[in-house]
C-alpha cells in the first residue's frame, strides 16, 4: 500500500509545473538567482539585484482579510516585490491586486516614519491565460492623473499582469512563460529554473521536500 501511494505521489509530482503555485513557491523559496532572473525579465531590466526571497509569506489581520504571498522578494534598493501565480482567472482579479498592494504597504512603515520614505512595491500576477485578452506579454497598471493628460501619479505602487499564454520564444517573457509551463526540466530554456525543477522532481532530497 505504501508503495502504491508513493507511485501515485510521483505521478502527481511529474505533472507539476512552475505555473502551479505550490510548486512555484517550493522551487523558489530563498532562491536568489532564479527569482532575480524572473524579476529582471518581467520588469524588463537587467540591474535588479535581489537580496532575499521568501515563499508563502502571510500578512495577517486579527479581524480582517489576510493574504499569503507565493514569493516575496526584496531588492538592493529595498523595493518589495510580490510574485503570484494564478491559474484560475478568479484568483487574479483587479481588486485582489489592489488589496495585495495595500497589505504590503501597511507593513513597510514604523510609527513616526515619513510617508515619503515608502519604498516602491510591485505586485506581479502571472496568470495561466491572457487576463486582458490583447495578446500582450505584459500589462502594466499605474495610477494616473486624469486632468493632467494622464500624467503618472508616481506613488511607487506598481501592478503587473504577466500573460502566461504568451509563448513567443523570440521574446524574454515568452521564454519565461515557456519554462513556467514545462513539466520536464530538460525542456526548459533557463538553466537556473531548470535546476530547481530538476532538484524537486528528480532527486530524493527534492522529492522528500515536496
Sequence positions of predicted segments:
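Conserved catalytic cores of phosphodiester-cleaving nucleases, focusing on short active-site segments
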Residues: 39, 69-73, 81-87, 124
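Mixed-charge intrinsically disordered linker/loop segments at interdomain junctions
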Residues: 90-196, 200
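Short, mixed charged/polar active-site loops
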Residues: 66, 78-80, 92
Amino acid at each position: 500500500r505504501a508503495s502504491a501511494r508513493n507511485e501515485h505521489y510521483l505521478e502527481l509530482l511529474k505533472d507539476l509545473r512552475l505555473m502551479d503555485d505550490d510548486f512555484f513557491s517550493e522551487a523558489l523559496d530563498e532562491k536568489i538567482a532564479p527569482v532575480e532572473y524572473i524579476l529582471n525579465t518581467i520588469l524588463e531590466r537587467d540591474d535588479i539585484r535581489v537580496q532575499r526571497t521568501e515563499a508563502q509569506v502571510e500578512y495577517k489581520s486579527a479581524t480582517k482579510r489576510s493574504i499569503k504571498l507565493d514569493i516575496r522578494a526584496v531588492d538592493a534598493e529595498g523595493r518589495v516585490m510580490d510574485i503570484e501565480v494564478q491559474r484560475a482567472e478568479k484568483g487574479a482579479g483587479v481588486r485582489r491586486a489592489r488589496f495585495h498592494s495595500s497589505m504590503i504597504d501597511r507593513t513597510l512603515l514604523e510609527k513616526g516614519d515619513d510617508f515619503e520614505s515608502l519604498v516602491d512595491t510591485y505586485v506581479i500576477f502571472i496568470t495561466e491565460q491572457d487576463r486582458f485578452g490583447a495578446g500582450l506579454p505584459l500589462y502594466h497598471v499605474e495610477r494616473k492623473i486624469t486632468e493632467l493628460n494622464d500624467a503618472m501619479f508616481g506613488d511607487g505602487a506598481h501592478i503587473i499582469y504577466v500573460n502566461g499564454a504568451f509563448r513567443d520564444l523570440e521574446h524574454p517573457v515568452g521564454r519565461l512563460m515557456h519554462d513556467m509551463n514545462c513539466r520536464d526540466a530538460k525542456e526548459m530554456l533557463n538553466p537556473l529554473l531548470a535546476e530547481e525543477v530538476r532538484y524537486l522532481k528528480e532527486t530524493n532530497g527534492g522529492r522528500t521536500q515536496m
